Design a protein with these regions (language model features):
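N-terminal, post-signal peptide beta-strand-biased segments of exported outer-membrane/organellar beta-barrel
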Residues: 20-112
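Outer-membrane beta-barrel "beta-signal"
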Residues: 25-26, 492-504
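Outer-envelope beta-barrel architecture signal
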Residues: 54-60, 96-102, 154-160, 195-201, ...
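Transmembrane beta-strands of outer-membrane beta-barrel pores
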Residues: 64-70, 106-110, 151-155, 164-168, ...
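Outer-membrane beta-barrel translocator domains and adjoining extracellular loop/strand segments
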Residues: 70-77, 113-119, 170-178, 212-219, ...
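Residues on the lipid-exposed face of transmembrane beta-strands in outer-membrane beta-barrel proteins
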Residues: 86-92, 145-151, 186-192, 254-260, ...
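Long, internal scaffold/assembly segments composed of regular secondary structure
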Residues: 233-373
Length: 504
């Protein structure tokens, strides 16, 4: 399996080589902060993404990523990781009216000291995970593929994009967890030029599946696996020795965008999406235990001037996410059939992130620089209905960053990024019936709340050097970056990243 994917990876790289040629302008277009200002909003529409870039650019590289926390900020994600990845990315301008882009990657590595989590994709499936009190290091493998195409005719644009991820996470000592994930996202976008604006709409669909199990081989016996249901609760009837389950889910979304055709004027973005994930117990004829629902709304409105040597942008953003969870009431079994006789919505989670961000930059033929800032309010409220449990925290945060890109000679270019951020807690609260909880569950919840309400400070830096081979359009690059995060609980995180590759 690995060999087949690796051959496909090399074939993709070989095909892309020779179809593009790197220039300083292409490097700036694909890496400058101001050129990618709307990457997380409008570029989710492939019709906009594919026609926002004008110059071909490809990279093939290997990278290593190391992260360590002195005490895990989130127990279920462990104390850090060491990951290695090989990746190829390309953008091709096929003609004045069409473009294609793609990526292929393989990642492998290790996640350290994961506890209270025996499932993959914790951020996505939390709180409906399989968990135990022992945990340990896990091994990770991931294959990723992405491809898109956009075309314009007259005033109309059309784009399509597919993103696929296959991931395998496992542990080779007891408790031997295993999670196998497949995740496919398809995007379709259209846009039309009318008046002074480009008006765009996009659709997105996602299909997700994970098979998840835990085994024990040691002679000392097993420990219970808990079917977690939120804020330190479990589905006790099916906890213990029921250790094989799977998740099925996915969803859909729609996004709308408006952008000025001359790169100066007001712009806006709105997105609505809905997803749901069922947890089913394979040990008991795939009876569904829980179902997690996501409802999200994103809105952004701003003004920008990106034409000429000066770049200015300012926008306001609001992200609302509602997560709710249903627990099925399962009747008495008959001939291995477990009837569902009802359901209760027991878990509720509300996340708010609202912020104002701005950018000011200056660019010329030999380089560009910009300053960018962000200030906002973040809130996370969780509730379990009965017995009543609550946990909440809110923070005000600010971030200031800068980027400097410069062509030092005909063959050497340099890029420097730096940033500082601070997240300060403004309110927090917890309601937990400790008297009715096991000691291990109490410790887990207290740890979660301890870091949920903490203050955080962050410093980050990244430097990249590009070298173009003499007489060739092929270049080499090296990139080194990292960050340092400290929190008010007297714990810290350090993160290092190294990448080496070629551009063409």
């Amino acid at each position: 399996m690995k060999k087949r994917y690796f051959i496909l990876f090399l074939c993709c790289v070989s095909w892309f080589t020779g179809r593009s040629a790197v220039t300083d302008s292409a490097r700036i277009e694909h890496h400058a902060t101001w050129k990618n200002w709307q990457k997380e909003t409008a570029w989710q529409n492939p019709a906009i993404h594919g026609l926002s870039l004008t110059l071909p650019y490809s990279e093939v590289y290997v990278q290593m990523d190391y992260l360590h926390q002195s005490d895990p900020f989130v127990l279920q994600k462990g104390t850090g990781h060491f990951l290695s990845e090989a990746k190829a990315e390309t953008f091709l301008r096929l003609s004045n009216h069409s473009s294609a882009w793609g990526a292929a990657s393989y990642m492998t590595g290790k996640q350290y000291q994961v506890s209270w989590n025996s499932s993959s994709d914790y951020d996505l499936l939390n709180p409906y995970i399989l968990a135990d009190t022992l945990g340990g290091d896990t091994h990770r493998e991931r294959y990723g593929f992405q491809g898109g195409y956009a075309v314009s005719k007259g005033k109309s644009q059309l784009g399509i994009e597919a993103i696929f991820r296959a991931e395998h996470e496992y542990r080779d000592v007891d408790p031997r967890m295993r999670g196998i994930v497949t995740d496919l996202t398809l995007r379709l976008g259209t846009a039309y030029d009318f008046g002074k604006y480009q008006w765009a709409a996009g659709l997105e669909g996602n299909v997700y599946k994970q098979t998840n199990d835990v085994d024990f081989y040691r002679e000392l016996g097993v420990i219970p696996e808990f079917q977690m249901t939120g804020l330190g609760t479990e589905y006790s009837r099916f906890s213990g020795d029921k250790r094989t389950l799977y998740y099925k889910g996915g969803g859909y979304g729609i996004n709308l965008d408006a952008n000025p055709l001359n790169e100066t004027g007001f712009y806006g973005h709105a997105k609505l999406w809905r997803r749901q994930y069922k947890r089913m117990l394979a040990d008991l004829n795939s009876v569904p235990l829980t179902q997690l629902f996501y409802h999200s709304a994103e809105v952004s409105l701003g003004w920008k001037h990106m034409g000429g040597p000066r770049q200015v942008a300012l926008d306001g953003n609001l992200v609302l996410i509602k997560r709710s969870g249903d627990e099925n009431i399962i009747g008495k079994s008959s001939a291995q059939y477990y009837p569902i006789i009802g359901k209760l919505t027991m878990y509720k989670n509300y996340l708010i992130d609202t912020y104002l961000r701005g950018l000011y930059g200056w660019g010329s033929g030999s380089g560009t620089w910009c300053l960018n800032g962000k200030i906002g309010y973040w809130s996370n409220r969780e509730r379990y209905v009965y017995p009543e449990r609550k946990m909440e925290a809110a923070k005000i945060y600010g971030r200031l960053g800068g980027q400097w890109m410069r062509t030092l000679s005909r063959t050497v270019a340099l890029t420097v990024d730096m940033a500082a951020a601070y997240y300060g807690n403004v309110s927090s609260g917890i309601v937990i019936p400790y008297a009715n909880m096991k000691a291990s569950f109490q410790d887990m919840i207290n740890h979660q709340y301890q870091f949920e309400k903490a203050d955080y400070g962050m410093l980050s830096a990244k430097i990249r050097s590009d070298y173009r081979l003499s007489g060739s359009q092929i270049g080499l690059f090296a990139e080194l970056g990292g960050n340092w995060i400290t929190c008010s609980e007297n714990e810290h995180q350090h993160h290092l990243h190294l990448a080496l590759g070629i551009t063409f």
